[in-house]
Amino acid sequence: MKQITLVAISLLAFLLGSCQQVSQSYYTYSGRLHTPYHIKYQYDKPLDNEIKAELDRFYYLFNAFDSTSIVSQINRNQLTQVEDSTFRSLFRTAMLVSAYTNGAYDITCAPLINLWGFGFSKQDSITPQHIDSIKQFVGYQKVQLKGKEIVKEDPRLILNCSSLADGTVCDMIADLFDKKGIQNYMIEFGGEIVTKGINQRGEYWKLGITRPVDDS
């Protein structure tokens, strides 16, 4: 009898939780920063302030165009001790991918990116000598994370976290939602996507690609 009662209580709790979840509204938070973003979630109230706080934290960590950001301070050698665990996690991921690809992926290659005009500046004439001079301070093996400290072999080395940053902000907001017990959400930021549960029609989230062809 005791076992039956426990099963009944568990089933009732599940049904009550499901009913509460179904009765909650879906909210949308969208806009454009350096890239468009779109966030949809089911909860008992909007979380605009909390989401904005995570976006602000994201930009404070990784925005290379903001001179006050953590990554900018590291690049200027004004900061070496990184207290934020999200930044350290992204750095460790970047090092793992760099090692796995034997350097084909490298978050220290920003000076070479700039050389071809894809970053902050563009060089009018590019020579092999110029490339070689820049390669002296490019390479993932030339920077390490020791505890909380970023250690560079060459002070001219700079980091560009943009290739992992958009996925990271999706994870940051997903973590916010998970801590609040949100079961249904979709987070899209610059083409990086995290989903959980179902949409407002009671279906699994469906993702589409505008131009599903190579080089689109």
Residue locations for each model-derived region?
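Mature catalytic core of soluble alpha/beta enzymes
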Residues: 4-7, 17-216
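Short, linear, compositionally biased motifs with a strong N-terminal bias
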Residues: 10-11
